[in-house]
Amino acid sequence: MVYSYTEKKRIRKDFGKRPQVLDVPYLLSIQLDSFQKFIEQDPEGQYGLEAAFRSVFPIQSYSGNSELQYVSYRLGEPVFDVQECQIRGVTYSAPLRVKLRLVIYEREAPEGTVKDIKEQEVYMGEIPLMTDNGTFVINGTERVIVSQLHRSPGVFFDSDKGKTHSSGKVLYNARIIPYRGSWLDFEFDPKDNLFVRIDRRRKLPATIILRALNYTTEQILDLFFEKVIFEIRDNKLQMELVPERLRGETASFDIEANGKVYVEKGRRITARHIRQLEKDDVKLIEVPVEYIAGKVVAKDYIDESTGELICAANMELSLDLLAKLSQSGHKRIETLFTNDLDHGPYISETLRVDPTNDRLSALVEIYRMMRPGEPPTREAAESLFENLFFSEDRYDLSAVGRMKFNRSLLRDEIEGSGILSKDDIIDVMKKLIDIRNGKGEVDDIDHLGNRRIRSVGEMAENQFRVGLVRVERAVKERLSLGDLDTLMPQDMINAKPISAAVKEFFGSSQLSQFMDQNNPLSEITHKRRISALGPGGLTRERAGFEVRDVHPTHYGRVCPIETPEGPNIGLINSLSVYAQTNEYGFLETPYRKVIDGVVTDEIHYLSAIEEGNYVIAQANSNLDEEGHFVEDLVTCRSKGESSLFSRDQVDYMDVSTQQVVSVGASLIPFLEHDDANRALMGANMQRQAVPTLRADKPLVGTGMERAVAVDSGVTAVAKRGGVVQYVDASRIVIKVNEDEMYPGEAGIDIYNLTKYTRSNQNTCINQMPCVSLGEPVERGDVLADGPSTDLGELALGQNMRVAFMPWNGYNFEDSILVSERVVQEDRFTTIHIQELACVSRDTKLGPEEITADIPNVGEAALSKLDESGIVYIGAEVTGGDILVGKVTPKGETQLTPEEKLLRAIFGEKASDVKDSSLRVPNGVSGTVIDVQVFTRDGVEKDKRALEIEEMQLKQAKKDLSEELQILEAGLFSRIRAVLVAGGVEAEKLDKLPRDRWLELGLTDEEKQNQLEQLAEQYDELKHEFEKKLEAKRRKITQGDDLAPGVLKIVKVYLAVKRRIQPGDKMAGRHGNKGVISKINPIEDMPYDENGTPVDIVLNPLGVPSRMNIGQILETHLGMAAKGIGDKINAMLKQQQEVAKLREFIQRAYDLGADVRQKVDLSTFSDEEVMRLAENLRKGMPIATPVFDGAKEAEIKELLKLGDLPTSGQIRLYDGRTGEQFERPVTVGYMYMLKLNHLVDDKMHARSTGSYSLVTQQPLGGKAQFGGQRFGEMEVWALEAYGAAYTLQEMLTVKSDDVNGRTKMYKNIVDGNHQMEPGMPESFNVLLKEIRSLGINIELEDE
């Protein structure tokens, strides 16, 4: 395997056995591809903005003599880049400009004669743009649009499973769901009549819809029934025989023909009888006259002579009617073929309950149902019905819907119209009747072939279309108003409705969510999330068990593990590692093709529907060298079931063992040894891990860490290979390799790093370079680590030395005992950054002012503010400190004569303002790391704002000039090369100042041309620099666009360092969570023979009942990894020669049976081996992929190599007494995370504070500075103790007895410790409520 430069620094030993056929795909592609499809111009007009425009335009006037046509659109450049948008609190978006053409036709001339054409580009609002990492910046905050899993459009056949009717009869129904438009449902009732509903309204007999489609009774019967034909010959009744129809019936008369009796009366007709009848080719048999009674006529019979109707279609025959028919000369009678088994009389029965008899009455019935209370007219009824399912504007099945519809009805073509046809409706009814007759199956709506993914692009397009349709109405009216000669397209389009629709979607849709930015994993998982909730989806309350359950089709598409606990379980899922969506939006997963029993590396992506037709082997099936299956019987999946198949039946094989799980679950080592419930918690808790001060890669990982870290976008990744030319904390400069340069560019890539910025969850985002000067890098190499990444690998927590043993009850109930060393070494110290904002507004009484001159505040409180009243950067502040001084004008108060006198003498005016400064919230303390001042245009900037501006300008200038210098240096080195090649001596050249080089002339014409080109580039560079600097200067100095009424905003950023402390929540990766109970001194912790104390003591009782054994295996393997690191460390300390190191490290990498990873250290230089060893001294990182991990034997081998006991247990000694514990203890290294549930954010205390208005009781919760509720169970406790006075105090003066409270306060101040309880306010509320019921209760004071 070829390792890149960064990977060589620390290679993870991989225990995976299965070959990696397919690399993990780019993890954010579901978001990026979808949005790309939305904004890029699609010449076919299938997707995105183009499709939306084409569906609405051209817009024609009502009169038809003018129309507005769409030509093309373009997106402009965003005004601010992503970082600026976040700082300023604006949306990162680009203006949308659309070219429209207004065509005016001649009125009197023949149709289509053009009078005038005007073309113009029209602004249509802003379209939010996606950042490179798949997020949107909306009003300065990063948001993610979650994909939605909704029911695919198409037709679905379902049953109520016997739950609707008390008899338990199964009622079948069919539902046609369009992408947009009215739903059409067909359903059976318990009497077996077929009904139809439109948009889930009241039901009508299904034949009404057929009548509305202009079918007569005769035609309807013709469509749905086979015929039985009777003939009257020589006063005998004969029936045309179709032998197959008799199967299973009991003969009610002798069946005979040609004198031979085939079936005797009363006998059951069997397949043998039918074969005989067919063999003898019997066409007609004689039947008794009574047999026809009760049969149903298939058409109208009219007496030719009188024109009178003898019997209408769908009437039951009686013997009288038969006689009448015979008399009037009808010798051939067609009846409907029905039986109780597989040809039910449903449509015939439905026609009997159908009140309508022609098209008009059917249309009127439908109109009455859709618009109750409105008088129907013929035109209204017709247009309503036409618009329901047959109008392109109101109804669209979409390409997906049509494909699913045709597949469901077993048609050959998969394309077709987006509206319904007569055939569509009839075919659905036929199939539904077939299912009722026992032919065919109902659909499974939880099958992933019936649910599809709607991603960002599609949802944004729908929203945009909604906006356009709103505009369309207005445009139509404007076009009809006349006087078009002076109008331009711009005057017709109002961009407000469009931008409002888009803004509403991105800002407040249920699926537009505040990005979870705790750590890189939580970002990636949030973008790969799939929700069944949201507009057009399910609701929590209505979703039953089936929808939430794991379905066989989830395999490889949706993760069976990662889903929230609680009310959303199973409704919010995560995309599997390799899954992607196909053109129709269905999830597909990759498989390896098996050809003639040989597994190839050819990859096919299959959707859930396609997968049902194949036999698919598991990824862990054993293969030989050529790719044949080793075993004769292979475990495979087929049609949702798992069973054994012979090896020549296999069609496909899984691509990878981690194909089943999501990114979050694929990071849990030994997942295969954990119970699923705990694995779910483990996957969810990794997303809550707070990035620690120094990231520490997991010793035991799964090999997915690198993919997650790189794809999440928190690291800086090299766009092109080259050599590191410059590196400091905030930027990295790469001189690009010659072969990767574009012709005529300087070949310098500059990466500016993010420093100490705040994430959505108030954690700290900071990038640190992990390359050094002169290092070669390749494209895709990690240049700088972000939060929670370590050398380009995801590192959410810390490797801790843990022991599983009880320790004095401090690990009771999942508590965790932590050594003081962990605190000393700052292993779990995290930085949190808070943003506090102070807004100065224009009030009715005058503007608020930001100033250091605040009334009634001492000098000490102002010591940290500058003269503008804003806190200094670097100041350490605690709760209650002033950060920004602000005064608000106060209303004029009535002054006493004395005050008036003083005013007159001293001109004192200070009491007109009140202090409304921004203070640090209680319980928060930290360091000010940044201050930003935003000033409205036209408001004078204060001194601090100007200082910040000056600083930013300086920084921008410095950045740009450094960039220019680097680029110049690159350019001049190329100029020098050209000059030297052209015959100029190098020494002379170096004596000349560089600017003069370009004036030199060369005799070689080609070289001279090159030189001139380079000179042009140099001029361009300088010009570009000036332009960039000017743009930057303009951006920095221009006023900010603030909300109306806001003059100034000051934002202060506080950094808070939080050490780990009792009450913080910690967890491993296997769902093993707990709260820290005590920080124990190092000397009291259990220690081993070498005197090494453990860091954490966990309770062994937390393992067996929870069945997450993965944590034990991780502990053992972590111990082995650390043991090998210790040996390497010892060798380095002894300064042993490189060869020995190389040999030992090679042995460690080669360990394990037939692992896929082959590390060949002989290709590494000595320097590289030394660097590798240096990075391995803290432990050799190990990958144990999900379902393909290290075996127990391999762990033991590794322990042996590290000179450790293969049991994984060692003798420990009690730190307090020095005595040995009575039995060996499992000790090892486990990766522990600190979760974002910190005791600092939860701890809260109150003495007095705010009260609720109505009940006068204290509020609840930390945010409201509330009290602790003394609830009814606590009252019972005090009652049980008989503590009457304590209880009285609790319910009166300590709660809501207003007078008692104030009196008590007064008494305490006076030193008189007595109390008089009064009437609690909540009792008065109760009295008022009872009075509202009309019962008067009064309290009589005796």
Curated annotation (Swiss-Prot):
Keyword field: Acetylation, DNA-directed RNA polymerase, Nucleotidyltransferase, Transcription, Transferase
EC number, as in UniProt: 2.7.7.6
Source species, domain of life: Bacteria
GO biological process: DNA-templated transcription
GO molecular function per UniProt: DNA binding; DNA-directed RNA polymerase activity; ribonucleoside binding
Coiled-coil intervals: none
Chain positions found as N6-acetyllysine: 1022, 1200
Record's catalysed reaction(s): RNA(n) + a ribonucleoside 5'-triphosphate = RNA(n+1) + diphosphate
Class of the enzyme per the UniProt entry, highest EC level: transferase
Pfam families (UniProt xref): RNA_pol_Rpb2_1, RNA_pol_Rpb2_2, RNA_pol_Rpb2_3, RNA_pol_Rpb2_45, RNA_pol_Rpb2_6, RNA_pol_Rpb2_7
GO cellular component: DNA-directed RNA polymerase complex
Entry-linked InterPro entries: DNA-dir_RNA_pol_bsu_ext_1_sf, DNA-dir_RNA_pol_bsu_external_1, DNA-dir_RNA_pol_su2, DNA-dir_RNAP_su2_dom, DNA-dir_RNAP_su2_hyb_sf, RNA_pol_bsu_bac, RNA_pol_bsu_CS, RNA_pol_bsu_protrusion
Protein family membership: Belongs to the RNA polymerase beta chain family.
Reported function: DNA-dependent RNA polymerase catalyzes the transcription of DNA into RNA using the four ribonucleoside triphosphates as substrates.
Subunit organization: The RNAP catalytic core consists of 2 alpha, 1 beta, 1 beta' and 1 omega subunit. When a sigma factor is associated with the core the holoenzyme is formed, which can initiate transcription.
Name of the protein described by the UniProt record: DNA-directed RNA polymerase subunit beta
Source organism: Escherichia fergusonii (strain ATCC 35469 / DSM 13698 / CCUG 18766 / IAM 14443 / JCM 21226 / LMG 7866 / NBRC 102419 / NCTC 12128 / CDC 0568-73)
Lineage: Bacteria, Pseudomonadati, Pseudomonadota, Gammaproteobacteria, Enterobacterales
